[in-house]
């Protein structure tokens, strides 16, 4: 019988993800520290006394192996933190494809694969960004994201449309910005909302929320950033450890609802 609550944190070999994993471990969770870079992931897990699990969120085969491992071990998931992310300084069709693959499609597919293994009152936390601001979209496109009836298949189709239009060279005419990271985080924040609506009647009562960690001193954020990783991880851990009946479908910064 599973005694400890189980948490899985993606992109946890360094930075904010590593700190989230560390804090959850200190709170009594059995933490699966997931990372694509096996060498860094194994080293981080060993140092923190956690379990390493290999995971490439862009690979359906890798996702399926993880889900299969939970099934074989008869483990139920209490917390899933989507932290893995990439940001490129330039913009082209390859960047659009690769950014969305990690920052949006990875969390969407991983959540779907792990939903059958989630226990009652599971919390799914998406590390998004304030840069994912819907004001970057043209008004007609922005209205589609603001539609309270937007569902997951339609959201996925919108994200696929962005990638396809960048490849075709007409994304701006369709209302998209030339900033793949921003679009990916708009999608990631929206994913928490549509999942909360989609699973509102699930008897397990799962909770789905997204957050902005702020500008954090990590490999992505750089040394000029204003926040330490402990500050960047704080709201994610707070959402991951909410009591049953906590918020769902929200976007948070510094433990408070935020506009985007």
Which ranges hold each PLM region?
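Rossmann-fold cofactor-recognition segment
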Residues: 46-61
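Catalytic loop of short-chain dehydrogenase/reductase
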Residues: 86-93, 120-201
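A hydrophobic alpha-helix adjacent to the NAD(P)-binding/active-site core of NAD(P)-dependent oxidoreductases
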Residues: 99-100
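C-terminal helical subdomain
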Residues: 109, 206, 210-218, 222-260
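Canonical Rossmann dinucleotide-binding motif of NAD(H)/NADP(H)-dependent dehydrogenases/reductases
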Residues: 1-32
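Rossmann-fold scaffold of SDR-type NAD(P)-dependent oxidoreductases
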Residues: 10, 77-85, 121-129, 209
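Conserved glycine-rich Rossmann-like NAD(P)H-binding loop of the short-chain dehydrogenase/reductase
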Residues: 27-43
């Amino acid at each position: 019988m599973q005694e400890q609550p189980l948490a899985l944190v993606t992109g946890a070999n360094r930075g904010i993800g590593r700190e989230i994993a560390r804090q959850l471990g200190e709170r009594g969770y059995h933490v699966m520290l997931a990372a694509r870079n096996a060498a860094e992931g194994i080293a981080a897990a060993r140092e923190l006394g956690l379990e390493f699990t290999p995971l490439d969120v862009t690979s359906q085969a890798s996702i399926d192996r993880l889900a299969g491992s939970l099934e074989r071990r008869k483990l139920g998931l209490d917390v899933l933190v989507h932290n893995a992310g990439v940001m490129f300084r330039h913009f082209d069709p390859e960047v659009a494809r690769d950014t969305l693959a990690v920052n949006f499609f990875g969390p969407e597919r991983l959540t779907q694969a792990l939903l059958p293994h989630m226990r009652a009152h599971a919390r799914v936390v998406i590390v998004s960004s304030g840069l994912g601001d819907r004001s970057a979209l043209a008004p007609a496109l922005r209205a589609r994201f603001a539609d309270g009836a937007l569902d997951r298949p339609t959201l996925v189709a919108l994200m696929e449309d962005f990638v396809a239009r960048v490849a075709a060279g007409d994304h701006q005419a369709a209302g998209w910005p030339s900033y793949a990271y921003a679009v990916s985080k708009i999608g990631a924040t929206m994913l928490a909302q549509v999942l909360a609506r989609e699973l509102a009647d699930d008897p397990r009562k799962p909770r789905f929320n997204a957050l902005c960690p702020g500008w954090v001193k990590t490999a992505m954020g750089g040394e000029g950033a204003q926040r330490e990783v402990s500050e960047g991880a704080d709201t994610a851990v707070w959402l991951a450890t909410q009591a049953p009946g906590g918020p769902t479908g929200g976007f948070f910064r510094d433990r408070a609802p935020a506009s985007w």
